[in-house]
Amino acid sequence: MSVNEQKAPELQEKLVQVNRVAKVVKGGRIFAFTALTVVGDGKGRVGFGRGKAREVPVAIQKAMEAARKNMVDVALDGTTLQYPVRAQHGGSKVFMQPASEGTGIIAGGAMRAVLEVAGVQNVLSKCYGSTNPVNVVRSTIKGLQAMKAPEDVAAKRGKSVEDILG
C-alpha cells in the first residue's frame, strides 16, 4: 500500500470546476472534459489538480490524483491565517486577512474551496481582477504558501519570537 492510499481516507476533496472543451476536426467536433479539484487534510496541507478526459468521471479522477501529488504545507495560526496576505497569478489577484473566531470563511467560489480543505475556518478574503477558477486557485495557494510562521522567521533572523512579534 502506497503513502497516498494510506492518507486517502483523511483527505477532503472538492470539485471546483468541470468544463467541456471541443477539438474541431474534419469530421466534426471531438468533445472532452477538464476538471479542476482541490484536496486538503484540514490541517494545513492543500493541493490542486487538473485532469482532462473524454468522460467526466475519468477527468475528475485524474484531477484528484494530480492534486494529491501536488500538495503543499501552509502555516496556519489555529483556524485562521498568520497575517494579511496578497497574491497574484495571471490576471487573478487575491487578498486574504485573518478573522476572529466565529467569523467563518468569507470567500467566494474557487477560493472558498481551497480555504475549506486547507483547514482555515475564519478568514476574510476578496478576489480582484480575473475570476477564472484555475488562476484563483493558483493565486490562493501561492498566497497561503508565502505565509511564514513567526518561529521560522525568528530562526532565520537569529532572534526570538518575542523580538519578531514586538
From Swiss-Prot:
Residues 11-74 form the S5 DRBM domain. Gene3D superfamilies: 3.30.160.20, 3.30.230.10. It holds the Pfam family Ribosomal_S5. Keywords: Ribonucleoprotein, Ribosomal protein, RNA-binding, rRNA-binding. The keyword rRNA-binding applies. InterPro entries: Ribosomal_Su5_D2-typ_SF, Ribosomal_uS5, Ribosomal_uS5_bac-type, Ribosomal_uS5_C, Ribosomal_uS5_N, Ribosomal_uS5_N_CS, Ribsml_uS5_D2-typ_fold_subgr. GO terms for biological process: translation. Disulfide bonds: none annotated. The keyword Flavoprotein does not apply. One of its GO terms (molecular function) is structural constituent of ribosome. It comes from the Bacteria. Belongs to the universal ribosomal protein uS5 family. Part of the 30S ribosomal subunit. Contacts proteins S4 and S8. This is Small ribosomal subunit protein uS5. It comes from Marinobacter nauticus (strain ATCC 700491 / DSM 11845 / VT8). The gene is rpsE.
